[in-house]
């Protein structure tokens, strides 16, 4: 999982996570948009990273909005995750072409502490700017969830450093 280059060009995930936590606890007037790319075969990693933040945001008086393409949140999962059942709203069966527009409208209202939407395609620069403006206006956070399959993840070149040493040869 990583946060988008749009949202955090010069920072690591840990500093981005601490910034998110600081923003949510200080209730500053800045909004935040972040893209979360995760492997479809490892959804627990995403839950482990996002749940503490969502639990903290659940303590605010505002709603949490989930814009899901097909999945329906289970009442049992919401409760077991420690999220406030009375503050979680979901709109499912939303067409991907309406997700960004719906996120912008929801973020702008200020009624939601967080708006989470699923998109398969990358955002355009214009869409990203619209989301950032809306999040700032509504003092809210928005997460673009982008699943990737394990097979497409495996075909990309891995980033890393090879250290060649003649000490071991």
UniProtKB/Swiss-Prot annotation:
InterPro entries: Cell_div_suppressor_SulA, P-loop_NTPase, SulA_CellDiv_inhibitor, SulA_enterobact. Keywords: Cell cycle, Cell division, DNA damage, Septation, SOS response. Residues 106-112 are annotated as: FtsZ binding. Residues 162-169 are annotated as: Lon protease binding. Induction: By DNA damage, as part of the SOS response. The keyword Nucleotidyltransferase does not apply. The record marks 169 as: Essential for degradation by Lon protease. Coiled coil: none annotated. PANTHER family: BLR3025 PROTEIN-RELATED, CELL DIVISION INHIBITOR SULA. Belongs to the SulA family. Component of the SOS system and an inhibitor of cell division. Accumulation of SulA causes rapid cessation of cell division and the appearance of long, non-septate filaments. In the presence of GTP, binds a polymerization-competent form of FtsZ in a 1:1 ratio, thus inhibiting FtsZ polymerization and therefore preventing it from participating in the assembly of the Z ring. This mechanism prevents the premature segregation of damaged DNA to daughter cells during cell division. This is Cell division inhibitor SulA. It comes from Escherichia coli O127:H6 (strain E2348/69 / EPEC). The lineage of its organism: Bacteria, Pseudomonadati, Pseudomonadota, Gammaproteobacteria, Enterobacterales.
